[in-house]
Amino acid sequence: MEILSVFDAEFKKYGRVLEGLDVTELLSELEKTEKPDGVVYKPSEPEFEKLTVFDVIKNNVYGGMPIQIGYCNGTNTKLNCVEYHRDSEINIVLQDTVFLLGLQSDLDNYTLKTETIKAFKAPAGSSVELFATALHYAPCDAKKGDGFRVAVVLPRSTNTDKPEIKPICEEDKLLFAKNKWLIAHKDTSEAENGAFVGLIGENIDIKDLI
């Protein structure tokens, strides 16, 4: 596996780098948040949502839809799972960060061969949109031991409690939280906690590439 850049042409299938957003204040607030040895995710951080950029992203990027800005911080080098939402996700990175990405079009009966996963590095301070069709999960370190802090923008209430549903189609078995469809590798805590197991092949680890 090669680690590509979000500025490479290959990334256009997965997302785009957003230009024109002033995220200076957001990055300052993000720097104050925790960065554990594992991975922590908080869907909504009130301090982020008081900032001017909150309304700019809500109106300019999401066209006025209700949004939340939270964070995903920690240290990680593995794929473990992929997820998708019904909309784009914006990731604003404090430091160089790697994303392991797949495509919904590569799914076969909601299974995915991990050999189809690509790695892309986003530079510090960049704002990266991942399209709704991009399969993704926790960010990865770009340099061994450095960890990451990433502000995560999604429609309001995404990744909160799973709705109670009566299954009507195969995709329903993937629903893991609100607006979150999850596909796990068998060797993960998510699989142990009932996530649909559909990643086929090696659980990718980039520790020897960084």
Model-identified regions with their sequence ranges:
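Active-site region of the double-stranded beta-helix
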Residues: 1-124, 137-210
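Tight coil/turn sites that cap or link beta-strands
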Residues: 124-127, 133
